[in-house]
Design a protein with these regions (language model features):
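N-terminal amphipathic, basic helical "cap/leader" segment at the start of enzyme domains
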Residues: 1-98
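Small-aliphatic-rich amphipathic alpha-helix that forms the alpha element of a beta-alpha
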Residues: 6-12, 106-158
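Conserved hydrophobic/aromatic beta-strand scaffold that supports enzyme active sites
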Residues: 27, 107-109, 170-172
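Short, charged/polar surface micro-motifs in flexible loops or helix N-caps
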Residues: 31-34, 114-115, 177
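A structural motif
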Residues: 97-106
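A glycine-rich helix N-cap at a beta->alpha junction
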Residues: 161-182
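Conserved small/polar residues in nucleotide/adenosyl-binding loops
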Residues: 195-201
């Protein structure tokens, strides 16, 4: 846990408009983490899609090209671990692994004040990426997980969080099984042509 504290201490230098630093982090491990995981495992059979998020993870009626990218991402992920589209049970089991932090020994729960707006959500995103990059530099792996937002009520009760804060996501930190097929799978990305460059060539060197 000391290494995680060190990572968070460096990551706090992430860009933040007006230096608001709007991220609020709960880092847990051991019995406290297991209690949350066990509680959700007990409930998930009755509520496979959780308690509903307090924000839209994706915009309603997602449109192309974003809809197609999301669909392909999901299909390719399940294909990498040989779970066919029609095997709903296996897909739900894979989703449930999110709620065990994929076996990671440390879990972060990331909150933001409900009054904050899009610029502050952007700050939180930059903070999270900074955490992930520093973790890698320190030899650790991480996984940011918005799936935890589906269980905000349960998590809040365990952590005794003031209602003025909203659970944005979780993040598992640990050591990845680099031999597992899912950890060698990569999402496809658009070519750099998505960037509209208007600078003279001489300014790019």
């Amino acid at each position: 846990m000391n290494l995680v504290k060190e990572i968070l201490d460096i990551a706090k230098q992430a860009p933040s408009g007006g230096n608001l630093q709007p991220w609020h982090i709960h880092a847990i491990s051991g019995k406290k983490l297991q209690k949350i995981v066990s509680d959700i495992e007990y409930k998930i059979a009755e509520m496979p899609m959780g308690e509903k998020t307090e924000y839209d993870v994706y915009p309603p009626n997602l449109w192309d090209p974003y809809r197609s990218r999301r669909f392909k991402c999901g299909e390719d992920l399940y294909k990498s671990i040989n779970i066919p589209r029609e095997d709903k049970g296996a897909r739900l089991n894979q989703l449930a692994k999110n709620l065990r932090f994929f076996g990671a020994p440390v879990g972060l729960f990331v909150y933001i004040d409900r009054k904050m707006g899009p610029p502050q959500w952007s700050d939180v995103g930059m903070f999270l990426q900074t955490v992930m990059l520093i973790a890698r530099e320190k030899g650790l792996h991480s996984c940011a997980q918005e799936a935890w937002a589906m269980w905000h009520s349960t998590v809040n009760k365990h952590l005794v969080v003031d209602n003025k804060f909203m659970l944005f996501c979780g993040m598992g930190i640990g050591y990845a099984d680099e031999n597992h097929p899912i950890n060698s799978w990569r999402t496809e990305r658009e070519a750099v042509s998505y960037t509209h460059l208007t600078l003279p060539t001489s300014d790019l060197v």
